[in-house]
Amino acid sequence: MLSVWITGASSGIGEACAYRYAAQGARLILTSSSAERLEKVAEKCRAAGATQVVVLPYDFSSNDDIEALVQSAWDATEGIDIVMLNAGISQRTNVEDTSMEMVRKIMEVNYFAPVAIAKDLLPRMLSAGGGKIAVTTSIAGRFGFPLRCGYSSSKFALYGFFETLQAEYYDAGIRVTIVCPGRVQTNISRYALDKGGKPHGVMDPGQAGGMTAEAAARVITNAIAKGKREVLVGRKELLMVYIKRFFPGLCAMLARMIKPM
């Protein structure tokens, strides 16, 4: 029986993955900043077949007591087989309109929080003989994306840390899956930070036409089960990842033409 901890579990990809693991009878730990939304997801997970559901609300914009959060999660199900580091925040501002306060907030949520959790979980997983760590990055972590300077930076940074973790601890039984979504129908654009740090408030048209969260969750959970190093999730927008690799000049030109909304 799997024990699975999912951050960013109150909506979108995290919520959809929670339901898939619930249907497998997993023991679930659900974390996000919204206790109310988490309770609703937890209710559905129990109805879907989860053996146990624990709700641990946490605001990742302030990570002062993250060690206590990790300890609570580990103790709740007496160990964790899989952690999905999925919580995140985006933005819709150009470089000029992006304050350093906004950059720091994005980095705190998107980079420092998952890194801190992974570092704190690692010795526990090693003592237990291994474990699986999945982290949600983005195609915006593979090439610069307009109106996403802080967001792209945080996702680029995740690649560096978690690819290193893959290399260092593979032989010790730690499997790291880097999840790279393109456009998926989630609330991330609604809660993205606009100029002044206020929520963007709408789903971007490109995102609205993207893959459903349920379809994304199926791809992601299958990749984690197979121990894949990386999984690309999306549709035609994923072509940019390959264009960047083989035709970087063309990628730079296309990035300038992207409609960022």
Give names to the regions the model predicted.
Residues 171-235:
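SDR active-site lid
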Residues 10-11:
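Conserved glycine-rich cofactor-binding loop
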Residues 118, 154:
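Active-site helix of classical SDR
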Residues 138:
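Residue(s) in the substrate-gating loop at a strand-loop-helix junction
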Residues 94-95, 99-104:
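Substrate-binding pocket helix/loop in short-chain dehydrogenase/reductase
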Residues 24-41:
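Conserved glycine-rich Rossmann-like NAD(P)H-binding loop of the short-chain dehydrogenase/reductase
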Residues 48-64:
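Rossmann-fold cofactor-recognition segment
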